[in-house]
Swiss-Prot record:
<comment type="pathway">
    <text>Lipid metabolism; phospholipid metabolism.</text>
</comment>
<dbReference type="GO" id="GO:0008654">
    <property type="term" value="P:phospholipid biosynthetic process"/>
</dbReference>
<dbReference type="GO" id="GO:0006633">
    <property type="term" value="P:fatty acid biosynthetic process"/>
</dbReference>
<dbReference type="InterPro" id="IPR003664">
    <property type="entry name" value="FA_synthesis"/>
</dbReference>
<keyword id="KW-1208">Phospholipid metabolism</keyword>
<protein>
    <recommendedName>
        <fullName>Phosphate acyltransferase</fullName>
        <ecNumber>2.3.1.274</ecNumber>
    </recommendedName>
</protein>
<comment type="similarity">
    <text>Belongs to the PlsX family.</text>
</comment>
<dbReference type="GO" id="GO:0005737">
    <property type="term" value="C:cytoplasm"/>
</dbReference>
<keyword id="KW-0444">Lipid biosynthesis</keyword>
<dbReference type="GO" id="GO:0043811">
    <property type="term" value="F:phosphate:acyl-[acyl carrier protein] acyltransferase activity"/>
</dbReference>
<comment type="subunit">
    <text>Homodimer. Probably interacts with PlsY.</text>
</comment>
<keyword id="KW-0963">Cytoplasm</keyword>
<comment type="function">
    <text>Catalyzes the reversible formation of acyl-phosphate (acyl-PO(4)) from acyl-[acyl-carrier-protein] (acyl-ACP). This enzyme utilizes acyl-ACP as fatty acyl donor, but not acyl-CoA.</text>
</comment>
<keyword id="KW-0594">Phospholipid biosynthesis</keyword>
<dbReference type="InterPro" id="IPR012281">
    <property type="entry name" value="Phospholipid_synth_PlsX-like"/>
</dbReference>
<dbReference type="Pfam" id="PF02504">
    <property type="entry name" value="FA_synthesis"/>
</dbReference>
<keyword id="KW-0443">Lipid metabolism</keyword>
Length: 339
């Protein structure tokens, strides 16, 4: 299995990208195609002495984070993310992994790979830590404005991913809302609720944001605006909590001594909330595996993102997504509005 890695995308490219790719290849996860500037990549590889199978596909064009995705794709047809995605389209790689611009990666996937089957809108699905292990949240940024049928399709895709890739039997799917009652929410969520209650999945109804971290819901569905806000808030909350703990610990000798006893537990907790543990987020709903990584991804995150890509390929995710029925045309009925 070959995975195309955009070696020039991300804040820490190419060094951390190459290190992560080498680590994944060394573990036998996959054969790696590093896409980027050959001279720079060879310099990095020379420092690492890779044991796995790695090849380089040269291109010196890069679409930066501050470039408009559509404009960048038009002007730089040989950019690293474009070439890496094209390798998937041509069957020369089974998946693409990138820590570059999310918007550019999405645009490249849609333009080059195309949408899956009857799916109208692709969605970014990410794992979030909970008291009962990682759960799936989607969409987290691909679509800031959605119609009810889009949320319905996100639920179908998330349900499939949770069952196939995460190995969760009969996943519990919930619709993120401002209340658990069926009549709560706006026009978007009311319409989505009516579609989902007749969907071929284990729909448990509306869930509130405060319930997410308890882990009772395996797949949480929302639009990309809300999902991205929750994701960024969660990242900031984790960082802030550990900063608060550190401040309290350093207030006295007694607290420092107590913290020493708790150190193994704190390290375990930090590992659970560390995004590098989860690697990258799949863009569901395109005709190929495209894994989107955090812009500041280090080698560990890249290695784990490649592992996510391998699992998606091994589970036949693209074919399964292409077989989904898409949103039905049933009439959406408005419920009562939230007070």
């Amino acid at each position: 299995m070959k995975i195309a890695v955009d070696a020039m995308g991300g804040d820490l490219a190419p060094r951390e990208i190459v290190r992560g790719a080498v680590a994944a290849a060394g573990e036998g996860s996959a054969e790696i195609i590093l896409v980027g500037d050959q001279r720079r990549l060879e310099e990095e590889l020379a420092l690492l002495h890779p044991s796995g199978r790695i090849e380089i596909y040269h291109t010196d064009q890069v679409i930066t984070m501050d470039e408009q995705p559509a404009l960048g794709l038009r002007r730089k047809r040989e950019a690293s993310i474009v070439v890496a995605t094209r390798l998937v389209k041509e069957g020369r790689a089974e998946a693409v992994v990138s820590a570059g611009s999310t918007g550019t990666q999405m645009a490249a996937a849609l333009l080059i790979l195309g949408r899956s089957g009857k799916i109208q809108r692709p969605a970014i699905a990410t794992l979030i830590p909970t008291l009962k292990g990682p759960k799936l949240l989607l969409d987290v940024g691909a679509n800031v404005d959605c119609r009810p049928e889009h949320l319905y399709e996100f639920a179908l895709m998330g349900n499939l991913y949770a069952a196939r890739v995460m190995g969760i039997p009969n996943p519990r799917v919930g619709l993120l809302n401002i209340g658990t009652e069926a009549c709560k929410g706006n026009e978007q969520t009311l319409g989505a609720y009516n579609l989902l209650r007749g969907a071929p999945l284990n729909f448990i109804g509306n869930v509130e944001a405060r319930e997410i971290l308890f882990g009772e819901t395996d797949v949480i569905v929302c639009d990309g605006f809300v999902g991205n806000a929750i994701l960024k808030f969660g990242e900031g909350l984790g960082q802030a909590l550990f900063t608060m703990i550190s401040r309290e610990v350093n207030k006295s000798l007694r607290s420092r001594m107590g913290a020493a006893l708790l150190l193994p537990a704190l390290r375990g907790l930090k590992k659970q909330v560390d995004y590098t543990e989860y690697g990258g987020a799949p863009l569901l709903g395109v005709q190929g595996i495209s894994i989107i990584c955090h812009g500041s991804s280090n080698a560990r995150a890249i290695k784990n993102a490649i592992k996510v890509a391998v699992r998606c390929v091994n589970q036949g995710l693209v074919t399964a997504l292409g077989d989904l029925p898409g949103a039905s045309e049933e009439r959406m009925v408005k419920g009562c509005q939230s007070n």
